[in-house]
Protein backbone atom coordinates (compact mmCIF):
# COMPACT_ATOMS: atom_id res chain seq x y z
CA UNK A 1 0.00 0.00 0.00
CA UNK A 2 1.24 3.48 -0.91
CA UNK A 3 -0.20 6.44 1.02
CA UNK A 4 -0.04 10.16 0.23
CA UNK A 5 -0.09 12.11 3.50
CA UNK A 6 -0.88 15.80 3.18
CA UNK A 7 0.45 18.22 5.80
CA UNK A 8 0.49 21.53 3.99
CA UNK A 9 1.04 24.10 6.70
CA UNK A 10 3.76 22.40 8.73
CA UNK A 11 6.39 19.74 8.11
CA UNK A 12 6.80 16.69 10.35
CA UNK A 13 10.53 17.43 10.23
CA UNK A 14 10.18 20.86 11.88
CA UNK A 15 11.09 21.34 15.55
CA UNK A 16 7.87 21.14 17.65
CA UNK A 17 7.26 24.17 19.82
CA UNK A 18 8.21 26.76 17.20
CA UNK A 19 6.00 28.65 14.77
CA UNK A 20 3.13 26.42 13.69
CA UNK A 21 4.95 23.22 14.62
CA UNK A 22 3.41 21.34 17.53
CA UNK A 23 1.55 18.18 18.39
CA UNK A 24 0.39 17.62 14.82
CA UNK A 25 4.01 17.45 13.64
CA UNK A 26 4.75 14.84 16.29
CA UNK A 27 1.63 12.93 15.26
CA UNK A 28 2.35 12.90 11.52
CA UNK A 29 6.01 11.99 11.98
CA UNK A 30 5.39 9.11 14.37
CA UNK A 31 2.36 7.71 12.54
CA UNK A 32 4.20 7.85 9.21
CA UNK A 33 7.25 6.09 10.67
CA UNK A 34 5.18 3.37 12.32
CA UNK A 35 3.13 2.78 9.16
CA UNK A 36 6.38 2.45 7.20
CA UNK A 37 7.58 -0.16 9.67
CA UNK A 38 4.38 -2.08 8.92
CA UNK A 39 5.22 -2.16 5.21
CA UNK A 40 3.22 0.88 4.08
CA UNK A 41 5.03 3.23 1.68
CA UNK A 42 4.37 6.81 2.84
CA UNK A 43 5.02 10.11 1.07
CA UNK A 44 4.31 13.20 3.19
CA UNK A 45 3.63 16.34 1.13
CA UNK A 46 4.29 19.67 2.85
CA UNK A 47 4.88 23.26 1.74
CA UNK A 48 8.52 24.29 1.27
CA UNK A 49 9.52 27.14 3.60
CA UNK A 50 13.22 27.43 2.74
CA UNK A 51 14.84 27.74 -0.72
CA UNK A 52 17.59 25.19 0.06
CA UNK A 53 15.27 22.73 1.78
CA UNK A 54 15.62 20.04 -0.88
CA UNK A 55 12.51 18.76 -2.60
CA UNK A 56 12.66 15.19 -1.29
CA UNK A 57 13.93 14.08 2.11
CA UNK A 58 14.34 10.33 2.51
CA UNK A 59 13.50 9.70 6.17
CA UNK A 60 13.38 5.91 5.98
CA UNK A 61 13.48 3.40 3.08
CA UNK A 62 9.71 3.66 2.61
CA UNK A 63 9.10 7.16 3.99
CA UNK A 64 9.75 10.44 2.19
CA UNK A 65 8.91 14.06 2.97
CA UNK A 66 8.30 16.03 -0.23
CA UNK A 67 8.66 19.82 0.04
CA UNK A 68 6.35 21.41 -2.52
CA UNK A 69 6.89 24.99 -3.68
CA UNK A 70 3.70 27.02 -3.18
CA UNK A 71 4.10 30.76 -2.79
CA UNK A 72 7.04 32.56 -1.16
CA UNK A 73 9.23 30.56 1.19
CA UNK A 74 8.91 33.11 3.98
CA UNK A 75 6.47 35.80 5.03
CA UNK A 76 3.20 33.87 4.73
CA UNK A 77 1.25 33.32 7.93
CA UNK A 78 -0.94 30.26 8.37
CA UNK A 79 -3.95 32.54 7.90
CA UNK A 80 -2.68 33.45 4.40
CA UNK A 81 -2.04 29.89 3.25
CA UNK A 82 -5.52 29.38 1.72
CA UNK A 83 -4.30 31.63 -1.11
CA UNK A 84 -1.73 28.94 -1.98
CA UNK A 85 -3.96 25.85 -1.99
CA UNK A 86 -4.09 25.72 -5.79
CA UNK A 87 -0.31 26.19 -6.10
CA UNK A 88 0.33 23.50 -3.48
CA UNK A 89 -2.02 21.05 -5.20
CA UNK A 90 -0.36 21.81 -8.53
CA UNK A 91 3.06 21.06 -7.05
CA UNK A 92 1.84 17.68 -5.78
CA UNK A 93 0.39 16.79 -9.17
CA UNK A 94 3.58 17.88 -10.96
CA UNK A 95 5.71 15.77 -8.63
CA UNK A 96 3.54 12.71 -9.21
CA UNK A 97 3.70 13.16 -12.99
CA UNK A 98 7.48 13.56 -12.97
CA UNK A 99 7.98 10.58 -10.64
CA UNK A 100 5.36 8.42 -12.33
CA UNK A 101 3.97 7.60 -8.88
CA UNK A 102 0.39 6.82 -7.87
CA UNK A 103 -1.22 6.21 -4.50
CA UNK A 104 -3.74 3.81 -3.01
CA UNK A 105 -5.00 6.23 -0.37
CA UNK A 106 -4.83 9.88 0.74
CA UNK A 107 -4.62 10.94 4.40
CA UNK A 108 -4.88 14.69 5.00
CA UNK A 109 -4.12 16.49 8.25
CA UNK A 110 -5.77 19.81 9.27
CA UNK A 111 -8.40 21.65 7.28
CA UNK A 112 -6.00 23.27 4.79
CA UNK A 113 -4.70 19.87 3.75
CA UNK A 114 -8.24 18.54 3.75
CA UNK A 115 -9.19 20.86 0.92
CA UNK A 116 -6.26 19.48 -1.09
CA UNK A 117 -7.12 15.89 -0.18
CA UNK A 118 -10.69 16.40 -1.37
CA UNK A 119 -9.53 17.48 -4.84
CA UNK A 120 -6.89 14.75 -5.11
CA UNK A 121 -9.43 12.09 -4.12
CA UNK A 122 -11.67 13.08 -7.02
CA UNK A 123 -8.74 13.26 -9.45
CA UNK A 124 -7.10 10.01 -8.40
CA UNK A 125 -10.27 8.08 -7.50
CA UNK A 126 -8.77 6.62 -4.32
CA UNK A 127 -10.12 6.69 -0.73
CA UNK A 128 -9.54 9.87 1.27
CA UNK A 129 -9.02 9.85 5.04
CA UNK A 130 -8.91 13.07 7.06
CA UNK A 131 -7.76 13.99 10.57
CA UNK A 132 -8.77 17.49 11.69
CA UNK A 133 -6.50 17.83 14.76
CA UNK A 134 -8.41 21.03 15.66
CA UNK A 135 -11.83 22.36 14.70
CA UNK A 136 -12.93 25.98 14.30
CA UNK A 137 -16.27 25.37 16.03
CA UNK A 138 -14.50 23.95 19.09
CA UNK A 139 -11.78 26.61 19.21
CA UNK A 140 -14.34 29.41 18.96
CA UNK A 141 -16.17 28.03 21.99
CA UNK A 142 -13.01 28.02 24.12
CA UNK A 143 -11.06 31.16 23.26
CA UNK A 144 -8.41 32.55 25.57
CA UNK A 145 -8.64 36.23 26.51
CA UNK A 146 -7.26 38.30 23.64
CA UNK A 147 -7.54 35.53 21.05
CA UNK A 148 -9.41 36.08 17.78
CA UNK A 149 -12.19 33.85 16.54
CA UNK A 150 -11.46 31.44 13.72
CA UNK A 151 -12.96 32.82 10.49
CA UNK A 152 -16.24 31.51 9.13
CA UNK A 153 -14.41 30.58 5.92
CA UNK A 154 -12.47 27.94 7.87
CA UNK A 155 -15.62 26.50 9.40
CA UNK A 156 -17.20 26.28 5.93
CA UNK A 157 -14.13 24.45 4.59
CA UNK A 158 -14.25 22.04 7.53
CA UNK A 159 -17.92 21.39 6.85
CA UNK A 160 -17.09 20.50 3.25
CA UNK A 161 -14.42 18.08 4.44
CA UNK A 162 -16.77 16.43 6.94
CA UNK A 163 -19.43 16.07 4.25
CA UNK A 164 -17.09 14.58 1.64
CA UNK A 165 -14.25 12.61 3.26
CA UNK A 166 -14.45 8.83 3.04
CA UNK A 167 -13.31 8.47 6.64
CA UNK A 168 -12.72 10.89 9.53
CA UNK A 169 -10.13 9.90 12.14
CA UNK A 170 -10.46 11.45 15.61
CA UNK A 171 -8.51 11.09 18.85
CA UNK A 172 -11.36 10.64 21.34
CA UNK A 173 -15.08 10.07 21.73
CA UNK A 174 -15.33 13.77 22.63
CA UNK A 175 -14.21 14.63 19.11
CA UNK A 176 -16.93 12.38 17.74
CA UNK A 177 -19.46 14.48 19.65
CA UNK A 178 -17.80 17.69 18.46
CA UNK A 179 -18.19 16.60 14.84
CA UNK A 180 -21.79 15.51 15.32
CA UNK A 181 -22.86 18.63 17.21
CA UNK A 182 -20.80 21.19 15.32
CA UNK A 183 -20.83 19.73 11.79
CA UNK A 184 -23.76 17.30 11.69
CA UNK A 185 -21.37 14.43 10.95
CA UNK A 186 -22.59 10.86 10.66
CA UNK A 187 -20.98 8.23 12.89
CA UNK A 188 -20.54 5.81 9.99
CA UNK A 189 -17.82 8.14 8.68
CA UNK A 190 -15.87 8.47 11.97
CA UNK A 191 -13.40 6.20 13.73
CA UNK A 192 -11.55 6.84 17.00
CA UNK A 193 -7.80 6.15 16.95
CA UNK A 194 -6.03 7.58 20.03
CA UNK A 195 -2.53 8.94 19.42
CA UNK A 196 0.46 7.74 21.39
CA UNK A 197 3.72 8.63 23.02
CA UNK A 198 7.21 7.38 22.28
CA UNK A 199 7.34 5.30 25.45
CA UNK A 200 10.75 3.92 24.48
CA UNK A 201 12.26 7.42 24.50
CA UNK A 202 10.18 9.08 27.20
CA UNK A 203 10.91 7.04 30.31
CA UNK A 204 11.47 7.78 34.02
CA UNK A 205 15.07 8.64 34.82
CA UNK A 206 17.23 7.53 37.70
CA UNK A 207 17.77 9.91 40.61
CA UNK A 208 21.20 10.64 39.20
CA UNK A 209 19.78 11.45 35.74
CA UNK A 210 17.16 13.73 37.27
CA UNK A 211 19.78 15.54 39.32
CA UNK A 212 21.90 15.99 36.19
CA UNK A 213 18.91 17.44 34.29
CA UNK A 214 18.27 19.89 37.11
CA UNK A 215 21.91 20.96 37.22
CA UNK A 216 21.89 21.58 33.47
CA UNK A 217 18.86 23.84 33.96
CA UNK A 218 20.49 25.60 36.91
CA UNK A 219 17.81 24.53 39.39
CA UNK A 220 18.74 24.11 43.07
CA UNK A 221 18.24 20.62 44.48
CA UNK A 222 15.36 21.34 46.90
CA UNK A 223 13.41 23.61 44.56
CA UNK A 224 10.07 22.31 43.30
CA UNK A 225 9.82 22.62 39.51
CA UNK A 226 6.67 23.20 37.46
CA UNK A 227 7.23 22.60 33.76
CA UNK A 228 5.39 23.83 30.67
CA UNK A 229 6.18 22.49 27.20
CA UNK A 230 4.60 23.77 24.00
CA UNK A 231 4.13 26.67 21.66
CA UNK A 232 3.87 30.03 23.39
CA UNK A 233 0.39 31.15 22.51
CA UNK A 234 -2.61 32.17 24.60
CA UNK A 235 -4.51 29.05 23.56
CA UNK A 236 -1.94 26.92 25.40
CA UNK A 237 -2.41 28.94 28.59
CA UNK A 238 1.14 29.79 29.77
CA UNK A 239 -0.23 33.09 31.06
CA UNK A 240 -2.64 31.12 33.28
CA UNK A 241 0.28 29.17 34.73
CA UNK A 242 2.24 32.34 35.56
CA UNK A 243 -0.73 33.94 37.32
CA UNK A 244 -1.40 30.73 39.26
CA UNK A 245 2.23 30.47 40.37
CA UNK A 246 2.17 34.09 41.53
CA UNK A 247 -0.88 33.34 43.66
CA UNK A 248 0.66 30.14 44.99
CA UNK A 249 3.78 32.03 46.07
CA UNK A 250 1.64 34.71 47.71
CA UNK A 251 0.05 31.97 49.79
CA UNK A 252 3.35 30.22 50.53
CA UNK A 253 6.13 32.82 50.27
CA UNK A 254 8.75 30.49 51.74
CA UNK A 255 8.21 27.81 49.11
CA UNK A 256 11.19 27.35 46.79
CA UNK A 257 9.63 27.14 43.34
CA UNK A 258 10.85 27.34 39.75
CA UNK A 259 8.81 27.49 36.55
CA UNK A 260 10.45 26.16 33.39
CA UNK A 261 8.70 27.16 30.16
CA UNK A 262 10.04 25.36 27.09
CA UNK A 263 8.74 26.60 23.74
CA UNK A 264 8.84 29.33 21.11
CA UNK A 265 6.44 32.10 20.13
CA UNK A 266 3.66 31.08 17.78
CA UNK A 267 0.74 32.64 15.98
CA UNK A 268 0.01 36.18 14.85
CA UNK A 269 2.54 38.72 16.08
CA UNK A 270 5.08 36.15 17.22
CA UNK A 271 5.90 38.10 20.39
CA UNK A 272 4.25 35.93 23.03
CA UNK A 273 7.62 35.26 24.67
CA UNK A 274 8.10 38.98 25.33
CA UNK A 275 4.54 39.28 26.68
CA UNK A 276 5.12 36.38 29.06
CA UNK A 277 8.44 37.79 30.25
CA UNK A 278 6.74 41.12 30.93
CA UNK A 279 3.87 39.38 32.74
CA UNK A 280 6.33 37.51 34.97
CA UNK A 281 7.97 40.83 35.86
CA UNK A 282 4.61 42.46 36.60
CA UNK A 283 3.64 39.53 38.83
CA UNK A 284 6.96 39.73 40.66
CA UNK A 285 7.98 36.16 39.83
CA UNK A 286 10.55 36.69 37.07
CA UNK A 287 13.30 35.51 39.44
CA UNK A 288 11.86 31.98 39.45
CA UNK A 289 10.77 31.68 35.78
CA UNK A 290 13.12 30.23 33.17
CA UNK A 291 12.34 30.34 29.45
CA UNK A 292 13.95 27.66 27.29
CA UNK A 293 14.05 27.41 23.51
CA UNK A 294 12.20 24.41 22.02
CA UNK A 295 14.19 21.20 22.34
CA UNK A 296 14.33 17.99 20.29
CA UNK A 297 12.88 14.85 21.90
CA UNK A 298 16.23 13.52 23.10
CA UNK A 299 16.73 16.74 25.12
CA UNK A 300 13.08 17.25 26.05
CA UNK A 301 13.22 14.07 28.12
CA UNK A 302 15.52 15.88 30.54
CA UNK A 303 13.07 18.76 30.92
CA UNK A 304 10.21 16.40 31.78
CA UNK A 305 12.37 14.48 34.26
CA UNK A 306 13.62 17.67 35.92
CA UNK A 307 10.04 18.81 36.58
CA UNK A 308 8.11 17.76 39.66
CA UNK A 309 4.88 18.66 37.86
CA UNK A 310 4.04 19.47 34.24
CA UNK A 311 1.20 21.94 33.68
CA UNK A 312 -1.04 21.82 30.60
CA UNK A 313 -3.43 24.79 31.06
CA UNK A 314 -4.69 24.73 27.46
CA UNK A 315 -8.02 26.23 26.48
CA UNK A 316 -8.50 23.33 24.11
CA UNK A 317 -6.55 20.19 23.19
CA UNK A 318 -7.78 17.48 20.85
CA UNK A 319 -5.65 15.13 22.96
CA UNK A 320 -2.53 16.49 24.67
CA UNK A 321 0.69 14.72 23.67
CA UNK A 322 2.77 16.77 26.12
CA UNK A 323 0.70 15.33 28.96
CA UNK A 324 1.40 11.78 27.75
CA UNK A 325 5.12 12.38 27.31
CA UNK A 326 5.45 13.91 30.78
CA UNK A 327 3.62 11.00 32.41
CA UNK A 328 5.76 8.52 30.50
CA UNK A 329 8.75 10.19 32.19
CA UNK A 330 7.15 9.69 35.61
CA UNK A 331 6.01 13.28 36.07
CA UNK A 332 2.42 13.95 37.21
CA UNK A 333 0.38 16.42 35.16
CA UNK A 334 -2.04 19.19 36.09
CA UNK A 335 -4.25 19.85 33.06
CA UNK A 336 -7.43 21.58 32.04
CA UNK A 337 -10.52 19.40 31.88
CA UNK A 338 -11.07 20.03 28.18
CA UNK A 339 -10.96 18.15 24.88
CA UNK A 340 -8.89 14.98 25.07
CA UNK A 341 -6.97 15.89 28.23
CA UNK A 342 -9.31 13.90 30.54
CA UNK A 343 -8.28 10.84 28.49
CA UNK A 344 -4.59 11.72 28.33
CA UNK A 345 -4.50 12.30 32.11
CA UNK A 346 -6.02 9.83 34.57
CA UNK A 347 -7.46 12.43 36.91
CA UNK A 348 -6.74 11.70 40.57
CA UNK A 349 -4.21 8.98 39.70
CA UNK A 350 -1.60 10.30 37.26
CA UNK A 351 -2.40 13.95 37.81
CA UNK A 352 -5.13 16.48 38.47
CA UNK A 353 -7.74 18.03 36.18
CA UNK A 354 -8.86 21.64 36.62
CA UNK A 355 -12.18 23.08 35.47
CA UNK A 356 -11.59 26.35 33.65
CA UNK A 357 -8.70 28.79 33.87
CA UNK A 358 -9.19 30.74 37.08
CA UNK A 359 -5.64 31.27 38.44
CA UNK A 360 -6.95 30.63 41.96
CA UNK A 361 -8.23 27.18 40.97
CA UNK A 362 -4.93 26.45 39.26
CA UNK A 363 -3.02 27.58 42.33
CA UNK A 364 -5.13 25.16 44.40
CA UNK A 365 -4.33 22.22 42.10
CA UNK A 366 -0.63 23.01 41.73
CA UNK A 367 -0.37 23.60 45.46
CA UNK A 368 -1.73 20.15 46.24
CA UNK A 369 1.17 18.53 44.42
CA UNK A 370 3.84 21.06 45.35
CA UNK A 371 3.06 20.78 49.08
CA UNK A 372 2.17 17.08 49.33
CA UNK A 373 5.28 15.06 48.52
CA UNK A 374 3.59 11.71 49.12
CA UNK A 375 0.72 12.48 46.73
CA UNK A 376 3.03 13.85 44.05
CA UNK A 377 5.40 10.88 44.26
CA UNK A 378 2.52 8.38 44.16
CA UNK A 379 1.06 10.01 41.06
CA UNK A 380 4.49 10.10 39.42
CA UNK A 381 4.99 6.40 40.07
CA UNK A 382 1.61 5.55 38.52
CA UNK A 383 1.93 7.93 35.55
CA UNK A 384 4.16 5.76 33.29
CA UNK A 385 1.72 2.84 33.45
CA UNK A 386 -1.07 5.14 32.28
CA UNK A 387 1.04 6.57 29.45
CA UNK A 388 1.98 3.03 28.38
CA UNK A 389 -1.66 2.46 27.36
CA UNK A 390 -1.00 4.79 24.42
CA UNK A 391 1.70 3.93 21.89
CA UNK A 392 2.37 4.98 18.31
CA UNK A 393 2.68 1.31 17.37
CA UNK A 394 -0.90 0.67 18.49
CA UNK A 395 -2.13 3.84 16.77
CA UNK A 396 -0.51 2.88 13.47
CA UNK A 397 -1.80 -0.69 13.70
CA UNK A 398 -5.37 0.54 14.14
CA UNK A 399 -4.99 3.08 11.35
CA UNK A 400 -3.47 0.54 8.96
CA UNK A 401 -6.40 -1.80 9.57
CA UNK A 402 -8.86 1.00 8.78
CA UNK A 403 -6.96 1.85 5.60
CA UNK A 404 -7.28 -1.74 4.40
CA UNK A 405 -11.00 -1.89 5.22
CA UNK A 406 -11.90 1.24 3.26
CA UNK A 407 -14.26 0.81 0.30
CA UNK A 408 -13.54 2.58 -3.01
CA UNK A 409 -13.48 6.37 -3.03
CA UNK A 410 -16.80 8.07 -2.45
CA UNK A 411 -18.56 5.01 -0.94
CA UNK A 412 -18.33 5.79 2.76
CA UNK A 413 -22.08 5.41 3.15
CA UNK A 414 -21.65 1.66 2.73
CA UNK A 415 -19.71 1.47 6.01
CA UNK A 416 -21.36 0.25 9.16
CA UNK A 417 -22.02 2.74 11.98
CA UNK A 418 -19.30 3.02 14.61
CA UNK A 419 -19.87 0.83 17.63
UniProtKB/Swiss-Prot annotation:
Question: What catalytic reaction does the record list?
Answer: 1D-myo-inositol 3-phosphate + UDP-N-acetyl-alpha-D-glucosamine = 1D-myo-inositol 2-acetamido-2-deoxy-alpha-D-glucopyranoside 3-phosphate + UDP + H(+)
The task this protein performs is described as: Catalyzes the transfer of a N-acetyl-glucosamine moiety to 1D-myo-inositol 3-phosphate to produce 1D-myo-inositol 2-acetamido-2-deoxy-glucopyranoside 3-phosphate in the mycothiol biosynthesis pathway.
Coiled-coil positions: none
**Similarity-based family:** Belongs to the glycosyltransferase group 1 family. MshA subfamily.
Q: What is this protein called?
A: D-inositol 3-phosphate glycosyltransferase
Q: Name one GO molecular function term.
A: magnesium ion binding
Q: Which PANTHER family match?
A: D-INOSITOL 3-PHOSPHATE GLYCOSYLTRANSFERASE, GLYCOSYLTRANSFERASE
* UniProt: UDP-N-acetyl-alpha-D-glucosamine binding residues: 15-16, 23, 231, 236, 295, 317, 325
If you read the UniProt record, what top EC class would you report for this enzyme, in one word?
transferase
Matching Gene3D superfamilies, A to Z? Glycogen Phosphorylase B
What Enzyme Commission number(s) appear in the record? 2.4.1.250
Q: Which residues bind 1D-myo-inositol 3-phosphate?
A: 9, 20-25, 78, 110, 134, 154
| NCBIfam families linked | mycothiol_MshA
Can you tell me which residues bind Mg(2+)? 304-305, 307, 331
InterPro entries per the record? Glyco_trans_1, Glyco_trans_4-like_N, Mycothiol_biosynthesis_MshA
Subunit relationships:
Homodimer.
Q: Which GO terms describe its biological process?
A: mycothiol biosynthetic process
UniProt keyword annotations, A-Z:
Glycosyltransferase, Magnesium, Metal-binding, Transferase
Amino acid sequence: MRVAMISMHTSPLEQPGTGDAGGMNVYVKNIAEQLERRGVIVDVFTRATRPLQGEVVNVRPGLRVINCVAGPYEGLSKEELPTQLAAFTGSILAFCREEGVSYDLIHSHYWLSGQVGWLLRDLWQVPWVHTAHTLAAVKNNSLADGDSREPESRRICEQQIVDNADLLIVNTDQEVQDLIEGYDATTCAIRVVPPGADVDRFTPGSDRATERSRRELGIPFRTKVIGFVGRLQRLKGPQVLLRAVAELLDRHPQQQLAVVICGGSSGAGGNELERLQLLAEELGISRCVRFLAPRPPEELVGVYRAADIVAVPSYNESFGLVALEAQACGTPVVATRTGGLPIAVDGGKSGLLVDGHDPSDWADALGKLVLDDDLRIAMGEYAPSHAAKFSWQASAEALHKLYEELPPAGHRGERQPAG
